[in-house]
Amino acid sequence: DAATGETIADSVFSYPRWGRQEYCSPAEACFRQHPQDYLDGLRHVIGEVVAARPDAAPHIRAVSVDTTASTPCLVDRTCTPLALRPEYADDPDAMFVLWKDHTAQREAEEITALCASSEINYARHSGNHYSAECFWAKCLHLLRGSRRLRRDAYAMVELCDWIPAVLTGADDPSAIRASHCAAGSKQMWAEAWGGFPPEAFFEALDPALLPIVRNISKTNRTCDHAAGTITPAWTQALGLPEGVVVGVGNIDAHAGAVGAGIRCGTVVLNLGTSACHMALMPSDEMGGRLVEGIFGQVDSSIVPGMVGFEAGLSAFGDVYAWFRNLLCWPLEELLVQPGAPDAQARQRLAEECRDKIMGRLAEEAERLELRADMPLATDWLNGRRNPYPAPELTGTLTGLRLSTTAPEIYYALAEATAFATKAILDHLAANGVAIERLTGIGGISQKSPFVMQLLADVTGREISVIDCKQACAMGSVVYATVIAGCYGSVEEAQRALCNFPSRRYTPRAERHPLLMQRYERYKAQGGLPQR
């Protein structure tokens, strides 16, 4: 409801190909998603909410989307992802390269080095470092790997730009209204140097990039702007009224911060498979100062008119999921036997154990008496994103004994993600970013009181977890109400719509001194893999 913020219908769609881990190779840090999953999800989710409230559907005035980023895809001249063409239907390199894909690490290092040696460091808005998770590294990696991709790829498009382009019928990659948030945060676009780095920069990197550079959209807008109007075909397919406006796309974590009601002084902790920590500052208070070693610092990336900051962990919930999968290995390999007479019963038992294991681990970990000699972990199972990116780092676990239990190991892993969060917050604060309150959103914040309490204990700060299961979608709602003309600004829409009750986690002061001893060991241990 655009007047109250009340959720009157919702829907969730799980991508089937992604669920089967098709086109992925975790051992190679390769994670791809098929564009058909997105199209199927779009039809399902909007169709389901429209069907749930046929009385409200005729009053829908705007649609906005947020997606993971940088999740780009090579497209042809009609802005069609190459994977939707028959000859590329099963080619992972023709699909969307998911944000956490690290196959472009070598290319990222080349870009970082070229930026450092250039007259202008074009990576300065991403902490003087360009990540393998970002647009140009992925683009270069794909082009270098396939002659036919170099032949057939006309441009590369972010997922958050492609969905609005699909809905509005934009079929020229160079003419779409791209996301300012994605361009500034992931593509080295900055007003200070007139947009993207010059062609000479890309030519020095690899001439294979030049056609892409020339053909991508040079026009981007903040998310309080419209990308266009939905086409008649999509209007009919989704059951929407005519004339629905489609907003410029946004990055999910940034939208989540808006949905959580972010304002200056708030750090929003978006805690899911990874973690993104978002903050705002007025431009004049930063005085042109850039924070080194974070993931993004971009004017108007989160809220128009404010500097948006992004930092985070490349693995958060994925760290816990790794441990769950490790413990479930015997269930999957020994208990489940498809040909056995009781195969269905075995499968049900394995699924029941898998569903319950994290909750039980958290219960037991919460009961542990905190000791200095407990196992200590680092959290870099997918590299370190911030502070000071080091994607080559790996996770560690020390202090194991014959008496070490599974809950103690789970505690160490959760504690490591909390220590990483504290390191980021301390780094932001030391560089002038105001931190007065912490707000938690995302799946982990909703599902794991144990992790949230541990975060409060480690950071020494109260954390409010808002009662909104889909904060990122709520941020898109905020943007949609602005482009529909219901509100004059993002801040005005937030005041009207983002008034959620919250659960508060207060730090337990008696645990803080011992946790800080362990934190110092965590930081020291973090130096070992780098020497």
Give the residues covered by each predicted segment.
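Glycine-rich phosphate-binding/hydrolytic loop that grips phosphoryl groups
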Residues: 109, 255-259, 313-317, 321-324, ...
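Gly/Ser/Thr-rich active-site cleft segment
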Residues: 112-250, 334, 378-382, 410, ...
